[in-house]
Structure formats: C-alpha cells, structure tokens
Amino acid sequence: MAIVSVLIGLGFTFFSGATEAWLVDALGATGFKGELESVFGRGQIVTGVAMLVGSVAGGFIAQRTSLGVPFVLRGVILIVMFAVAFKLMHDVGFTPRKGGKLSTELRALSSATLQHGWGVPAVKWLMLEGVFVGGVGIYAFYALQPYLLELYGDPHAYQVAGLVAAIVAGAQICGGVAAPRIRSLFHRRTSALLMTGSVSVATLALIGSVNNFYAVIGLIVVWALLSSASRPIRQTYLNGLIPSRERASILSFDSMMASLGGVGVQPTLGRAADVWGYGPSYVIGAAVSALSVPFIFLSRKQNAPADTIEVVEAAVEPQVGPAGIEPATTES
C-alpha cells in the first residue's frame, strides 16, 4: 500500500505541472484576455464537484462491496482519462523540441529548473512558502475525521467522515467562485495571499483550541474556503514568474517542494496528536503554517511584474522581471 501511495504521489507531482503549463500556454497562444484566476477557479469548481460526487459514490460502493473496489474503479477512470487526454490534448502555443541523450536532457532540465526557479528570488520564496503550507494542509484534512468524531462523542458516527468530504468539496467550489473576487480587492496578488494565509493560520489555531463540535465545523468551512480561494491566486502569480519553456518543470518542482514539506510535517503532527491529542496538533500545525507568511512577504519584496499584471497578457507581450527573466513566453 505504501508503494502504491508513493507511485500515485509521484504521478500527481509530474502530471499537475504538465497540465497547468499546457493550459497557460494555450491561453496565451489563443489570445485570452480575461483573468487567469477565473480560469483556475473554474477548474477548481470542477474538481470540487468531482470530489463531492466521488466521495458519496465511493462510500456507497465500498459499503455495498468492499474497500478495494473504489480503488480499482479509480484506476480504471485514470486509464480512460489518459486515453482521452492523449487523443484530445494537443500542444497549443508550445512546440516541443527534439531531445538528445537522456543524461544530457536531465542535466539541462535540472540546470534550467534551478536557474528559472530557485535562481529567481520571487519564485524561490514562493516555493519555500509551499513547503510549510502543503504538509499542514494535507494533515489538517485527514485528521479532521477522527478529530470531529472525538468532539462529537460517538466514534461510530461515520456520517461525520462524509460531512468532512462534503465541506472540503463545497469549499473548493465556493473558493473557485470567490478567487477572482478576492483578487479584485487587492492591487497585488501577494497582498491577497498574505491576507488569506494569515487568516488561515488563525483559523487553524482556533480549530485546535475550541472544543465545540459545531463551532469547529464552522471554522473548518472558513479554513477550507480560504485555502481554496488562495490557490488560483497563487497559481496565477507563480505562472507569471516563469518562462513558458520551463513552466512544466518548475511547476512540478513546486509541487515536489510542497510534498517534501509533508514528509517532515505530517509525521510530526501525527506524533503530536498521539501524545497531546488532535486539538494541540492543530495548534502546532498553525504555528508551522505561520512560518510560510514571511516567505510570501519576501516574494512580495521582489516587486515582480506578475504580482500586479495579468499573466496571460504578459505571455503575449513579455515583460522582464527583476532577475531579467521573462515572466512568460510562447517560444519553445
């Protein structure tokens, strides 16, 4: 089971970066002039709906058959999805180049990722922010079910588990709708990220401090909504900081950084829950999340053009960032 989880995680890390890069390049090449937050927001709405349907259907199927059947169905759906993507997804705004030897390409890829990712301060600080947020977010979601059962006082109230999935899925849908509106309230994207990040930290601390089931439910709604609304804004900002030809690699590297944070953070918080309880583990998680806020501020201090301009417009008319890197380009 552990090996399967590792393989699924690796697949998601690489798949997420490539898909997002494909979307942004295609939008730039087709002359899209709208807000990129709204596009990512719509994608998140679809994800939320799918999560809601999948959670309900998965629970129903598992109850009628076995716990293994939903995993088999997930594998079948992924195979169908890959076939559909292979048939329908074509590169628009990006022309693949013929590669050389594998070792040479890997060295070039690593060098480009370091140069355009870690070598650009605004990108580097944003990636470090993800290290602290990613691990805490995953732990907070999976620990909610036993924590709420504990607060509810009935360890067999399995409907609570479904309630958690429904809350998070609903928050993804609402967050996708709210992201462009929240962004419009601020001149800079980092201002929106600082606000949502700071309030999320406070909400996590309250989730671990309030020993009332219904109050915690309300706080979970706020936390999940803020996390979901900030994601499209962060995606838009990050995409505007990196060139098209390196987009997929750097986005995958960013996803990997968040996963690496989870490797250290999740076991630590799990151990804290074993020793002190779920409530204190959420308070500790809030303290870890608070470490991400200074990195957003450091990224903000770089005054990158992507912090204020529309990313897709930047892809059409490149503007040079503080490190001499074009935020986006349709060249290959």
Language-model regions, residue ranges each:
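Short amphipathic helix-loop junctions that connect adjacent transmembrane helices
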Residues: 142-159
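Substrate-agnostic recognition of the 12-TM MFS/MFS-like secondary transporter fold
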Residues: 1-63, 74-81, 86-90, 125-146, ...
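A membrane-interface helix-boundary motif in multi-pass transporters
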Residues: 60-76, 154-162, 270-289
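Structural signature of the two symmetry-related core transmembrane helices
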Residues: 75, 191-205, 283-286
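Helix-loop junctions on the cytosolic side of multi-pass membrane transporters
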Residues: 67, 74-101, 297-309
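C-terminal ends and interior cores of transmembrane alpha-helices
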Residues: 1-3, 198-211, 297
